[in-house]
Amino acid sequence: ELIGLIPASMREDLLDGIDVKGELQLAAKVEGTYNENSMPAVNAEIKYNKGMISMPEMLPYSVTNFNTHINADIDLNDKSDVYVNYLKANMSNSSFSLSGNIKDVMDKMYCNLKLDATADLDELQSFIPEDIVAKGVLKLNATANVNNYQITNMDFTDAKINGNMQWDNMNVVYCDTINVVADKLNVDLSIPNSTSEDLTNSLAAVNISGTNLDAKVADMIVAGLKDYSITAQVSDVLDENIPMSVYADYSFSRIDASMDDMNFFANNPHGSVAMFMEENNDAT
């Protein structure tokens, strides 16, 4: 009904190829003085329920079950804050949920956010680079405490990011040459690395685990891992001024590999490995 109030000429420009439905509730309080030197402060509450958005030219499926509740304190004379109580949506078999807040949204952008998402990659191939074919179901849970400076400068030394990714029925093909298959792949990421004992300049802790993983490079190399776990401490790879370094503990119940006429296997290998880059980029 609200869209019907928009002049037809404007609807054609703004909503061409877009179909939007749902129930919108808006409440706002405006307080202050409007003049050349001042703008009134606005306290707003936005609720959008039973939403549906269809954009065939951009999205392969309609966005459904779009529900959100947002509070905003907008003060252009000082700082503005946005509070996302919840923002949820589905797209076919994929889903998305976001909550948290963004302080000083017009400038510093101090973000404290929580994300939960499920992506059915079979349905989202149009968003994936053409030289990659990816299948399976990707589940992501993450929390982030970052700001605009850190994001813009890719400097996460003072950021706090924790996340878990679970990839079920993983099947990835790159350039029709490299194929990686796993029944379930788990990746845990933590920034900063709170357990950095073996790497003094460690930025992140990464844990990769799963039950079965098979990889193939053309018809030359075939390899497989069973019951694998890799726990790595990684330096700030985004800082070009810091030589890259990695320290990792690993354990597998079995490794199998073959190349041409050579075959290799090992039962229960485990240990630690370290790589340190010197200033001249030589690895040791």
Model-identified regions with their sequence ranges:
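Short, solvent-exposed beta-strand/turn "edge" segments of beta-rich domains on protein surfaces
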Residues: 17-19, 133, 154
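Hydrophobic lipid-interacting interfaces of membrane-associated proteins
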Residues: 1-4, 19-35, 44-107, 116-126, ...
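Short, recurring structural edge motifs at helix starts
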Residues: 13-14, 129
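Short glycine/proline/serine/threonine-rich loop/turn segments at secondary-structure transition edges
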Residues: 38, 109, 152-154
